[in-house]
Amino acid sequence: IFMSKIKKINSAKIILPSIVLFFTVVLLLSLPVLLNYNSIQNIIEKKVSSEFKINLKILDDISLKIFPRPHYLVKKANIDLNIENDNSSIIETNNLRIFIPYTKIYSKSNITIKEIELENANIYFKIDDVLDFRNHLYYKINKPIHIKNSKFFFLDKNNKTIFISPIKKINYSINKKSNSKELKIKGNIFDIKYD
């Protein structure tokens, strides 16, 4: 009888703090979601420009999502590879994720960006942009950019579409073993699949 009372007391001592700890963690992770992140639009744009060497123009609301990994979700944005040339290629996206560490979910001024992910983007690329893209490959950037389920539009000098290529996935990152940049593309051109 005495042993069964001890087991009941011990299990209550474990279960109750576990429940309190669980709800405390959920509450702490949920609080930043309620804040307004449109005020840090300029900070995010400058940080992306300095760390990824791309021009980001946020066109719609910014929100913070905690799961599955903490990230800022930008509903609509334009991205440009050449910071100095306004006529360079543009990527239009309706779903831009900017991933941040868990330790920075409360920070609005000291933002750390781990990687960027674009989904359902339209990539407009001209023959003149090949040089901009090649130059971008030489920048010392070690944070990955991922593009998923997007369309690549190749344009002529008059901005008329020559062809459209669906892209399943693009991974643009540094291979840490060989210390070189990698560009992995999965999609198809003229019904020919490429990896």
Question: Where does each model-flagged region fall?
Answer:
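N-terminal type II signal-anchor transmembrane helix
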Residues: 2-53
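Flexible beta-edge/linker motif
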Residues: 12, 18, 33-40, 47, ...
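A short, amphipathic edge element
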Residues: 54-60
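Short, intrinsically disordered, charge-balanced linker/junction segments flanking boundaries
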Residues: 191-195
